[in-house]
């Protein structure tokens, strides 16, 4: 483990922003997420969301979760319970609102190639106005809850914050399932995992980050997701105003294409730390924290009235409950997830029973630290090494 002090933090992105050099320079920039208009409400299927997270990493979706997902247990509110963080991105001549996902490597978007009934409410990519089609190239993604998307591939200009590339592979949806259509706030996904797991056939394409990182001061991005508020992505530099104390670095395992790493233990509430570490993935595209069964069971033993519900497809408890904090140990650093974040959402509109923000990884062999974990941290994703850095948010 390496601890990186604030005083040594990389702030080259700030200095390059005021550089007067006429030649193209490397840079750093910040892109803010936004909350979509409050009238863009939708229905989320909590067990379906859980199933997608398991299937995304090749996990087995339990039958009880499949059945719960098929029954459509849901809650309806604007931008439900931090389920997604959306970021404006210019693709060709269109501005779209995308989910930045460190657990996948595709840039796919709603497009005007979709049937008109599936376009309603979404901002659309129009490849005919700006793009070059990659003849014979296709993409096809499916998830454990039955949701799917597929289509053609184009080469086009993509701008995120202060950086533009005119040669980015863009996957335009021509077929998409109702689960995606219903979410009118979200126009697609921008993957920030390693390019090795891009799904384009016959040849995988490069992620936006891998395409533009040579333009950045440093080949990294940092994430500050927030609870009940839009978050921020810093590309090319580290903003020391966004964290407290020091950044603790650990090696990232990219062998499976994800931002994987090893933890050194965990603790529940005020209890002592377990020295049993686990392998994990830092994933902004997963909402929940997915852990080994023994850790999940140990956690909910400390939550009054908690039970594993087949009907709901996971652990639930009274919405009036204050769950204990959950702490992940990384070297000498303790990353604390406040218990209120783990009281995730009512299992249905008006219900007094809530779905837990910690659920089983169903024997996946990896733990997934999604947004419930990440919105308590400032996390640095550095492709040099590669390595991950963690610090408490300021």
Curated annotation (Swiss-Prot):
Coiled coil, from the record: none
Protein name: Aspergillopepsin-1
InterPro entries: Aspartic_peptidase_A1, Aspartic_peptidase_AS, Aspergillopepsin-like_cat_dom, PEPTIDASE_A1, Peptidase_aspartic_dom_sf
Function statement: Secreted aspartic endopeptidase that allows assimilation of proteinaceous substrates. The scissile peptide bond is attacked by a nucleophilic water molecule activated by two aspartic residues in the active site. Shows a broad primary substrate specificity. Favors hydrophobic residues at the P1 and P1' positions, but also accepts a lysine residue in the P1 position, leading to the activation of trypsinogen and chymotrypsinogen A.
Family: Belongs to the peptidase A1 family.
Positions of the propeptide removed during maturation: 21-69
GO biological process, one term: proteolysis
Signal peptide (from-to): 1-20
Subunit structure comment from the entry: Monomer.
Gene Ontology cellular component annotations, sorted alphabetically: extracellular region
GO molecular function: aspartic-type endopeptidase activity
EC number: 3.4.23.18
Entry annotation: catalytic residues: 101, 283
Start and end residues of each Peptidase A1 domain: 85-391
Catalytic reaction annotation: Hydrolysis of proteins with broad specificity. Generally favors hydrophobic residues in P1 and P1', but also accepts Lys in P1, which leads to activation of trypsinogen. Does not clot milk
Disulphide bond pairs: 319-354
UniProt keyword terms in alphabetical order: Aspartyl protease, Disulfide bond, Hydrolase, Protease, Secreted, Signal, Zymogen
Protein's cellular compartments: Secreted
